[in-house]
Amino acid sequence: MTAQPPAREDAWALLNEYNQSESLIKHALAVEGVMRYMARKHGEDEEKWGVIGLIHDLDYERFPDRHCQKTEEILRENGWPEEYIRAVISHGYGICTEVEPKTDLEKTLYAIDELTGLVVTTALVRPSKSVMDLKAKSVKKKWKDKRFAAGVDRSIIENGCQMLGVELSELITDTIMGMREVADEIGLKGEA
């Protein structure tokens, strides 16, 4: 018997059960927004991509040393489909898992997870504190300064671009567009 695809409400409840950090919740919402945008752009299942984006860091706050492994256990216990579990685990490829992203969904999650952090940090240093007026060239300018958002592993983003066969500028633009759709929820609407 195949597990039923989880509804967004189920993912949201699970996320909030394991996370109290406002910044982690906002990160999950940002990744969900970008995943939904990318699914629409590529004619994929927006609900599935969004739910996977929302739940991808489920275990990070409580179990940072077991990131992805603990999420696998939790999702299995909750009867999530294997496809969803594999996608979530694959975003930690080369960091905390050896599950390589294979599908477009998995490659996208892998590529944009770190990138959302760079976009947020870039937006927050701008006068508007918003993604609504943010352009890819501003993010690329900050990209070059390795001290800026030093916690963002740019090599993961570059590997993700290679996996997807897209240029960095295109991925940045798509990430910004997806984040604009959830700008209110992630606190980056600003005054723009």
What are the residue ranges of the model-derived segments?
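Active-site oxyanion-binding pockets that recognize sulfate/phosphate
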Residues: 17-21, 102-105, 165
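C-terminal binding/interaction regions
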Residues: 19, 138, 144-191
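Acidic/His-rich, divalent-metal-binding segments that scaffold phosphate/diphosphate chemistry
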Residues: 1-63
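Predominant activation on well-ordered alpha-helical scaffold segments within soluble catalytic domains
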Residues: 12, 16, 32-36, 69-72, ...
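Conserved active-site and cofactor/substrate-binding residues in soluble primary-metabolism enzymes
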Residues: 6, 10, 26-30, 66, ...
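Divalent metal-dependent catalytic cores for phosphoryl transfer on phosphate-bearing substrates
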Residues: 42-149, 158
